[in-house]
Amino acid sequence: MTKKPQAKDHIFAKNMLPGDFIFDEKVAGVFEDMINRSVPGYSTIIAMIGVLAERYYQKDSIIYDLGCSLGGATFSVFERLKDQGCSIVAIDNSIAMLKRLVTKQQKFEGAHYCIESRCENIQVAQIENASVVILNFTLQFVPLADRAALIERVFKGMNSGGVLIISEKIISPDNHLNELIIELYHQFKENMGYSKLEISQKRSALENVLIPETLDSHRARILQTGFSSFEVWFQSLNFASMVAIK
């Protein structure tokens, strides 16, 4: 499959009026470039989500990608499990994102049989008979007060032995180290071609929208919900991916 060049992310390249970050048509159009240049190790996370899904998938169960955006994790899982006739439900509340996912889906042979896309709020989406649930940089956008209820909803809809994969931007409980890691992260973004203006403006836009937590907060919530085990399997700077087993 020949890939078209990614549209370049220049959304925050010029001075803008303050406003919250939203997943609109403009963001969806450059999201693939944006996420790959903004999240260290993103391609590794996406590839390994497919590997984890293949390991924990249960025959005739359902795989959920909650907050699927353009379907990076969805298609990684599909490529691993397409020969098993898997059922993947990809959910997002951004129509602009889902339109592009559906277009991309047409390029994967057999994907229309396996992947169902839904424009829904993941906080009220029905989850049942799930062996794999993915929250790939999604939980961080859910209001803090609602996160425990969402994880509880996921847990109740999962089969025993199933896996929950959560990727998140995180913070350190140590203020000095937290500032150090943020500075290193901004240097990473500069190395990826973003200007100081772009970094500053995007940070301001995300300030009230993306609320990161510590790894200990994630661990406590997961174990309190009833998952039998939890581990961080990947971390680069202030981004981590975790697994929880029911």
Regions found by a protein language model. Give the residues of each.
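A conserved beta-strand element that flanks and buttresses the S-adenosyl-L-methionine
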Residues: 134
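Conserved alpha-helix/loop element of class I SAM-dependent methyltransferases that forms part
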Residues: 41-59
